[in-house]
């Protein structure tokens, strides 16, 4: 039997309340039913973030082709704007969507969604082909309409929908109480009680949870749930006030749940007005399932004092945990609780107080609760719920012999559109989008937008060109087609020529429509296009496609001192966008993958994330015709080579410091630097060109062709790679290809890529002394023999064809390196919820432990007269720090400074902060820039104290002191 279920209640505020929990477990039970069930669920694309979150949760027990989206047209709630034409159109679009899926039976899981949100539940109508049933929970708002339906539009909306319940072929009730409510209020309704259960996830956690509450002299009475009027929480302070003084003093009341603060304040005010101890009222926020179980187990009593409940899940869960429950004798609660000593009149604080006192005074209810627990476990199970539902639905289902013709379905819905005299504006598109995609061919779309747009030849674009070129030669991997794409505006993605030579002609092709069998791979650098791409990537996720982002490095986050000032915030925004839309990340090294994983942990990222990496290719085919053998005539002393763009991150100053000290102490060695002039390289270039050894033992080649590079590698005895941070390390791989030893800074990625070099020595990153020691050891050994031995064996590293195959192995064949899983088990987290990215309060002194170190040789004088240097900030605490705080500017963590004149007088303390870009995790080190503006130098600034500061809170102490007259290099301002 093919069953379709309206899943919009998993997108609205219901998703985190009783209805959402019920429907999710109901769907899981149906999907896992032993019956011949083919279950399908549809979500409303108008609530995009919520649809993606629900889609992710449903994948726990449904396949992608069982989860669908349709596009509603309503933008407001019915109780706010009425039953508008947009809602009528949405009903038509949803009807057409269901007809296209052709289930044997359709089920509306929650009929009262869309009061204050865009949800449009499916109701019976003339165009709908399959029989339609609904789940009926209760009619509490109607029973207490003076409380819940005060406005005429709210009452009209509720009554319109309640009256329509008589047109459903069957109502599935969740308790005997709700079944009787339906019979009483809905004339001619046909219903059955399918009951409810405790989630398997909850039971699994309970069975594995070893937590045992500690013996505590204080007792605890706990309420878990919402605070609206019918929950009757206001009776609890009144009952507490009637307890004996000893119990009042020895008992805490714990309020748990995601509560609006004004409602909590009302409870607190009532508590205080009754003279109850303020310290006895404790508030807990939204709790996870594991936390919930521990709350149940640690409580002496769980309260459920509602005026009316359609079921009583809190009471059921607490009793399954063996905890006494005191519940009102109203609604469906007596069906669950079943012990008279634990039931009370919800209008009597005195009776509630007596029940509390009876249990806290030592009433032995354990035998009764143990017996009831066994009984409840048998009665209320989701397996039984699924069996009951399947039996009830099978009675009214109509089996579809074959899928209907799509054209006939379009004609059918067109009749209803005409009869309803609907304006067709926007409706045609909504109806078209309502039709499920039928093409199940697997496709991998590779974004190359930036490379096509700019035609630059940066490192990233070299990767994009090589990967796209190799993909174009394959065209297909297994059953997956490989397609290069381009997107630069709101129209979406288009197929691009694999040569990447020009933009696609949008007038001769249609934009790509993504489906559940597709994967979108964001290979190119899309930092400047993140906002443009985000909308289309969300649409791809809505339709079930995978979105994989490529991460080259985290340099702008971890070492902003080595970037243009505008780059870190742009990169941060891109990464946030990528984290919102991606189902996975592929990194260009294992080291970067590990850094990403640690970042997700540090911000408590609340979603699952696949993380993989692949090795970039090293293409030596263009060197085949060149002489790659070692030169026969070698220098009488060691020759060292650096290859890479001139920029502060590459560590050229460290290398020059080491050689300066070495040359001064008798080290006889040459240093050749190969690299074009890069960002922030003015001081480095000036230092090289004015160096006394320049042209003698120090050489700089800013541009070389392939043949010259080969000659330089062959003439060298070792490569030096001194970077502070990298995403890869191509020169190390190249050195391995030419068989020369490597001396590298000890960073994880260099450890990783040194597999591509036969012999690598490491020195302490950023330490010229450590580098000099390593150079001396190299020179003191038989360096000629060592270099010769290294050249004999050339380690294997993938070429670009093999690299492309590795990449496909990760994305298509799903050979992921690791999967990040959040610690919290909260469901339905919005994709835009990225965890913790800011401080909302001051960091406690215990969380402020840190170390500051000025990077040697980093002091520079800018051309405009300002001064700049780099500070290494190490988090020595157990708490993650964030550069962002509240919107009013408070609580972000940054480097600040105080300036003093030559006499030690304070000149200035309110200065430009150098912020942590995103998050600085415990044990990690970030390199932050500090800039002193020219005007303060002109006013006599002679020294500086650099210190961590949390804005609006405190300076953290242990400042670094630095004299501004120290050696410096002149840097031009771009």
Which stretches of residues belong to each language-model region?
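Carbohydrate transferase catalytic cores enriched for Leloir-type hexosyltransferases
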Residues: 1-833
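Low-complexity, acidic Ser/Thr/Pro/Gly-rich terminal tails and inter-domain linkers that flank the onset
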Residues: 828-862, 876
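Short beta-strand elements of extracellular/lumenal beta-sandwich folds
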Residues: 864-880
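Short, acidic/polar linear motifs in exposed loop/turn regions
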Residues: 874-879, 885, 936, 952
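Short coil-to-beta strand junction motifs in C2/discoidin
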Residues: 884-894
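Short beta-strand and strand-turn-strand segments in soluble, beta-rich domains
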Residues: 892-894, 898-916
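Intrinsically disordered, low-complexity Pro/Gly/Ser/Thr-rich segments with frequent PxxP/GP/PP motifs
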Residues: 907-937
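Terminal connector regions
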Residues: 936-971
């Amino acid at each position: 039997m093919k069953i379709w279920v309206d899943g919009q209640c998993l997108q609205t505020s219901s998703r985190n309340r009783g209805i959402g929990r019920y429907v999710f477990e109901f769907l899981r039970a149906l999907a896992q039913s032993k019956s011949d069930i083919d279950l399908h669920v549809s979500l409303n694309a108008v609530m995009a973030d919520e649809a993606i979150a629900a889609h992710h949760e449903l994948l726990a027990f449904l396949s992608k082709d069982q989860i669908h989206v349709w596009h509603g047209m309503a933008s407001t709630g019915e109780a706010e704007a009425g039953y508008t034409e947009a809602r009528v159109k949405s009903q038509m679009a949803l009807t057409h969507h269901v007809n296209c899926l052709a289930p044997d039976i359709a089920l509306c899981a929650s009929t009262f969604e869309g009061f204050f949100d865009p949800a449009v539940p499916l109701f019976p109508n003339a165009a709908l082909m399959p029989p339609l049933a609904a789940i009926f929970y209760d009619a509490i708002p109607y029973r207490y309409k003076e409380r819940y339906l005060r406005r005429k539009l709210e009452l009209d909306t509720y009554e319109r929908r309640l009256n329509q319940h008589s047109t459903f072929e069957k109502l599935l009730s969740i308790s005997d109480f709700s079944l009787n409510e339906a019979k009483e209020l809905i004339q001619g309704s046909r219903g059955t009680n399918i009951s409810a259960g405790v989630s398997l996830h909850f039971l699994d956690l309970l069975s594995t949870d070893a937590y045992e509450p500690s013996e505590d002299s204080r007792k605890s009475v706990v309420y878990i749930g919402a605070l609206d009027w019918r929950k009757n929480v206001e009776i609890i302070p009144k009952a507490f006030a009637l307890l004996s003084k000893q119990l009042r003093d020895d008992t805490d009341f714990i309020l748990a749940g995601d509560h609006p603060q004004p409602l909590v304040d009302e409870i607190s005010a009532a508590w205080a007005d009754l003279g109850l101890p303020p310290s006895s009222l404790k508030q807990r926020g939204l709790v996870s399932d594991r936390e919930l179980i521990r709350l149940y187990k640690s409580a002496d009593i769980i309260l459920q004092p509602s005026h009316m409940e359609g079921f009583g899940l809190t009471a059921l869960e607490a009793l399954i945990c063996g905890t006494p429950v005191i519940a009102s004798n109203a609604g469906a609660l007596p069906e669950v609780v079943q012990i008279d000593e634990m039931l009370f009149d919800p209008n009597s604080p005195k009776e509630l107080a007596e029940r509390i006192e009876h249990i806290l005074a030592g009433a032995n209810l354990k035998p009764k609760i143990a017996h009831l627990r066994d009984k409840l476990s048998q009665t209320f199970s989701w397996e039984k719920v699924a069996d009951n539902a399947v039996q009830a639905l099978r009675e009214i289902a109509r089996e579809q012999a074959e899928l209907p013709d799509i054209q006939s379905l379009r004609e059918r819905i067109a009749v209803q559109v005409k009869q309803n005299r609907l304006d067709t504006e926007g409706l045609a598109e909504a109806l078209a989008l309502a039709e499920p995609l039928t093409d199940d061919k697997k496709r991998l779309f590779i974004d190359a937008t930036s490379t096509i747009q700019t035609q630059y030849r940066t490192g990233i674009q070299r990767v994009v060109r090589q990967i796209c070129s190799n993909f174009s030669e394959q065209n297909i991997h297994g059953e997956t087609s490989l397609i290069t794409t381009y997107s630069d505006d709101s129209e979406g993605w288009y197929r691009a020529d694999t040569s990447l030579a020009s933009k696609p002609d949008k007038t001769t092709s249609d934009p790509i429509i993504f489906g559940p069998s597709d994967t979108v791979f964001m290979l190119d650098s899309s930092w400047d296009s993140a906002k443009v791409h985000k909308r289309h990537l969300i649409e791809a996720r809505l339709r079930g496609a995978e979105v994989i982002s490529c991460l080259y490095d985290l340099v702008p986050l971890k070492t902003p001192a080595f970037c243009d000032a505008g780059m870190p915030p742009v990169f941060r925004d891109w990464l946030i966008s990528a984290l919102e839309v991606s189902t996975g990340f592929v990194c260009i090294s294992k080291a970067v993958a590990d850094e990403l994983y640690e970042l997700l942990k540090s911000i408590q990222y609340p979603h699952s994330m696949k993380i993989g990496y692949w090795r970039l290719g090293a293409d030596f085919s263009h060197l085949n015709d060149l002489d790659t053998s070692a030169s026969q005539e070698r220098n009488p002393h060691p020759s060292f080579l650096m290859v890479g763009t001139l920029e502060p991150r590459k560590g050229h100053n460290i290398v020059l410091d080491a050689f300066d000290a070495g040359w001064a102490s008798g080290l006889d060695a040459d240093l050749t630097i190969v690299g074009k002039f890069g960002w922030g390289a003015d001081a480095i270039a000036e230092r090289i060109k004015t160096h006394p050894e320049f042209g003698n033992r120090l050489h700089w080649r800013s541009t070389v062709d392939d043949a010259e590079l080969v000659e330089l590698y062959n003439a060298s005895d070792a490569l030096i790679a001194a970077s502070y941070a990298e995403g890869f390390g191509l020169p190390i791989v190249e050195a391995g290809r030419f068989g020369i030893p490597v001396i590298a800074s000890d960073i994880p990625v260099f450890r990783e890529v040194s597999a591509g070099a036969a012999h690598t020595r490491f020195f302490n990153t950023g330490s010229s002394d450590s580098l000099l020691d390593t150079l001396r050891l190299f020179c003191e050994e038989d360096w000629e023999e060592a270099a010769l031995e290294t050249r004999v064996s050339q380690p294997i590293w993938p070429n670009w064809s093999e690299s492309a195959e590795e990449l496909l192995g990760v994305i298509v064949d799903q050979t992921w390196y690791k999967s990040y899983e959040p610690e919290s088990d909260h469901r339905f987290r919005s994709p835009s919820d990225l965890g913790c990215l800011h401080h909302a309060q001051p960091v406690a002194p215990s969380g402020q432990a840190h170390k500051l170190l000025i990077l040697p040789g980093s002091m520079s004088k800018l051309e405009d007269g300002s001064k700049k240097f780099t500070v290494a900030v190490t988090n020595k605490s157990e708490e993650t720090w964030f550069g962002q705080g509240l919107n009013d500017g408070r609580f972000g963590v940054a480097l600040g400074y105080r300036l003093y004149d030559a006499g030690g007088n304070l000149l200035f303390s309110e200065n430009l902060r150098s912020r942590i870009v995103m998050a600085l995790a415990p044990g990690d080190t970030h390199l932050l820039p500090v800039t002193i503006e020219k005007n303060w130098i002109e006013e006599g600034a002679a020294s500086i104290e650099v210190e961590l500061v949390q804005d609006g809170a405190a300076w953290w102490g242990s400042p670094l002191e630095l004299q501004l007259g120290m050696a410096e290099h002149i840097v031009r301002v771009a």
